[in-house]
């Protein structure tokens, strides 16, 4: 996940949203469920390290607006399967390479 984000930008991940998560207002989130169910999609845009606690975390953007979380974003602990964030991720990769020899035509 880190390599993909570093090289190509944000990735899409499914998570198991809970009532507790809906109330998130800041900090590094941590919640693991015994039987998770993916029910929401978010964009993982980066990662970091809290040096005070030596905790690695993902930085993700939610779709609930800037009033929620950390101005629409949240941090969630890495490597502990929190909300199943590391189980169901995808990255968009173009299936073509532009050919510079071909001219693009625009019609009006």
Predicted segments — roles?
Residues 1-108:
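Active-site signature of cysteine proteases
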